[in-house]
């Protein structure tokens, strides 16, 4: 009886040892352009959001902004996947109505302005498969220059006169996108 107990104990210990290796996980390092989110109202205690955007934050890392975001080409507006913007109520971009729901945000940078594009495409990697036919709304807004420089591409919502403003910033470039109710 002692012999069978010893064999059983060894068998259980061996099985446990093997299962430890089988359950070991290999997790990837932090992405070079980490994902972030911005919402309005931006108080985390406020559950009734109007809009939320999920995007990736590329870094300049000594590179010129013009290398990373060329003028005259549709840009994914960040890194990796194009940003997904969710409106929890009907809004407007310019005079175009945007129904509550999820969309993709693209931009078309030019020298003194940038065209904001809301597309019905979802789960889009980059801007490689962008189709103008799927645009829901477009608005050309001016680009301004700030005194301070942002290393990481950033987005934040603020309160506007008649709705919400999506502020985009990278390097010294600043853009204010008005969404109205």
What are these regions (language model features)?
Residues 6-12, 50-53, 85, 98, ...:
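Weak global preference for isoleucine
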Residues 23-76, 124-181:
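Primarily secretory-pathway and cell-envelope proteins
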Residues 12-21, 106, 111-113, 118-119, ...:
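Alpha-helix boundary/interfacial micro-motifs
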Residues 75-124:
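Mid-length scaffold segments of soluble, non-membrane domains
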Residues 1-27:
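Bacterial Sec-dependent N-terminal signal peptides
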């Amino acid at each position: 009886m002692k012999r069978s107990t010893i064999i059983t104990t060894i068998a259980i210990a061996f099985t446990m040892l093997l299962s430890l290796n089988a359950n070991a996980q290999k997790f990837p390092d932090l992405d070079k352009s980490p994902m972030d989110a911005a919402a309005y109202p931006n108080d985390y205690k406020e559950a009734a959001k109007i809009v939320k955007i999920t995007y990736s934050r590329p870094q300049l890392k000594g590179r010129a902004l013009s290398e990373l975001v060329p003028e005259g080409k549709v840009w994914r507006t960040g890194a990796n996947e194009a940003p997904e913007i969710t409106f929890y109520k009907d809004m407007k971009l310019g005079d175009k109505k945007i129904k509550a729901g999820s969309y993709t945000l693209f931009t078309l940078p030019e020298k003194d302005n940038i065209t904001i594009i809301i597309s019905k495409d979802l789960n889009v990697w980059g801007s490689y498969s962008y189709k103008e036919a799927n645009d829901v709304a477009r608005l050309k807004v001016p680009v301004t220059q700030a005194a301070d420089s942002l290393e990481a591409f950033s987005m934040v919502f603020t309160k506007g006169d008649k709705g919400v403003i999506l502020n985009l910033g990278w390097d010294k470039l600043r853009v204010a996108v008005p969404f109205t109710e």
